[in-house]
Amino acid sequence: MTGAYLVTGASKGIGRAIAKEIAAAGFPVIALARESIDLGVTGAELANLNSNSLTISCDLGDGADIAAAAKIIASKYSHLSGIVHNAGMIGPIEHMLEVEGADWDRSIQVNLIGVQDLTNRLSSMIGDKNHTRIVTVSSGAAKRAVPHWSAYCVAKAGLDMWTMCMAEEGESKNISAMSISPGIVDTEMQVKIRAAEKFPLVENFRSYHSTGELSAPGDVAKQFLPYCIGRLGGNGQRLDVRDL
């Protein structure tokens, strides 16, 4: 039995591109993101590709939003064939001894804690008789410290370990999990990085953009697709799109 695929952060960038690739491959997609005009656009595009798709507004920084979204998903679908945990935020881009505590906490909540909360609330819909593939979107920042990105680095490192734990504990429940780093992609996150004047490496990222080194979200999504739907990739793997 094939169920729906849940993609978080699906209103734009990599998330929207992955959601569209999955829907175009013939699967219903649940697109999750904060309420916005972009989410509405994504919903219309997905409906044209697969009429059983759905968009749900949800802020992964808000536990009540996560609970409400999980309830809607459970009321409309019986099984999730896959989850793509793509939602994330780069900020705060600040020295870790100067950053506001609330901003740092929100980054950890959105990038890491919300992943566990949402997945846990959907536990009755994943694995068991039918396989579920969980993919988390990783980053090079999970492997090395980037100045002024402390919250993002910590969250992404934690997300990699979360994925490994899910791979270990989910295997007996017919769940496989893996993480994929997309490389440097032309998204709104990159726009925010290039605008961060106090970021020590800002000129590096401006150069990536000006010299055309950024990947297009659609190209990255095509590489992600076979892993998201379980046709490629092993349980517990961590991959980089640039090596595929």
Predicted feature locations:
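Active-site helix of classical SDR
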Residues: T119, A155
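Substrate-binding pocket helix/loop in short-chain dehydrogenase/reductase
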Residues: E94-M96, E100-D105
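C-terminal helical subdomain
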Residues: S179-P182, T187, A196-L244
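Conserved glycine-rich Rossmann-like NAD(P)H-binding loop of the short-chain dehydrogenase/reductase
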Residues: A25-V41
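Conserved glycine-rich cofactor-binding loop
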Residues: S11-K12
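Active-site-adjacent segment of SDR/Rossmann-fold oxidoreductases
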Residues: I126, R144, C165-I175
